[in-house]
Regions:
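Bacterial N-terminal signal peptides that target proteins for export
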Residues: 1-7
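C-terminal motif of bacterial Sec signal peptides marking the signal peptidase cleavage site
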Residues: 13-16
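N-terminal soluble domains immediately following signal/targeting peptides that reside
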Residues: 18-277
Length: 277
């Protein structure tokens, strides 16, 4: 595949774990980063493979300096979603000294997958983070599962994820969802940090696959606030087993929310369908 270029917005338009949608406000200057060294030897459903890539700066040199720290806004988030929003892969590969990433992957099924490389460079200036995109097609008969309507409760490996009330969400506005997670025994789940956060709220829009990503972090953890334009948002843990998820989406439509957390040592992914006006 040829390297895909991305206009990275520098005028404080999309920051934090930003969106891939067309910006809603006027922007100023742009800088161009692109994916380079993209190698995927094979892509067969159910069989391990390794994806290699790097991020090239506008100068052509590989980006080697990424943010570090205890929070989630560090390094690179590699997020891969199937086009029907029926499967997601979320990894945090580590950069080598020369800026190369090598990540083992297994695609669960055939299909078309959108790859999001959400990068946090350790650079001076207003650029907080940016996203680069690719598409991978895994050969075979691809499943197509119509998105189910909103259901307040999803059960994953015996754990119950329940959203309180019926969400009333509006684009480009701060919204919050209350989420309760209980063990199979019915007791509140205990969360431990995974990839720097107690919970990741990953959003993809049906059809266009626009992307946004917010977090819930432990108290006093830095690098947890997501930004869209001038709006900032961060989730919180309100009590054991209870999360207040931040929702900040750039456009209306049907969105799929993937809540990912590590509860009692188990990494869980709970999907919800949301309507945004």
């Amino acid at each position: 595949m040829k390297p895909a270029a991305l206009a990275v917005l520098v005028a404080v338009v999309l920051a934090g774990c930003g969106s891939s949608s067309p910006p809603q406000i006027t922007i100023g200057a742009a800088r161009t980063y692109q994916l380079g060294g993209w190698v995927l030897p094979s892509a067969t459903a159910g069989k391990p493979t390794t994806l290699s890539f790097r991020i090239d700066q506008p100068s052509g040199a590989a980006l080697t300096n990424y943010r570090t720290g205890a929070g989630p806004h560090t390094g690179v988030h590699l997020i891969i979603v199937r086009s029907d929003l029926g499967a997601i892969i979320h990894k945090h590969p580590k950069a080598s000294a020369d800026g190369e990433f090598h990540q083992a992957l297994t695609f669960p099924t055939p299909g078309r997958y959108r790859v999001v490389v959400d990068a946090y460079p350790n650079l001076s200036g207003p650029l907080r983070n940016f996203q680069l995109f690719r598409v991978i097609t895994v050969p075979g008969a691809a499943p197509h599962q119509p998105l189910p309507p909103f259901k307040p409760t999803v059960t994953v490996s015996g754990y119950r994820f329940t959203i309180g009330g019926r969400p009333h969400l509006r684009a480009v506005q701060s919204n919050f969802l209350t989420l309760h997670v209980t063990r199979p025994s019915g007791q509140p789940a205990t969360f431990t940090p995974w990839f720097g956060a107690l919970a990741h709220a990953i959003f993809f829009r049906a059809g266009s696959l626009d992307y946004f990503h917010t977090h819930v972090c432990s108290a006093r953890t830095t690098g947890c606030t997501s930004v869209l334009g001038a709006t900032r948002i961060m989730g919180t843990q309100t009590r054991p087993g209870a999360l207040r998820l931040g929702v900040l989406l750039p456009v209306g439509g049907t969105w799929r929310l993937f809540v990912q957390c590590k509860a009692d040592g188990h990494v869980l992914t709970a999907p919800f369908t949301l309507d945004v006006r």
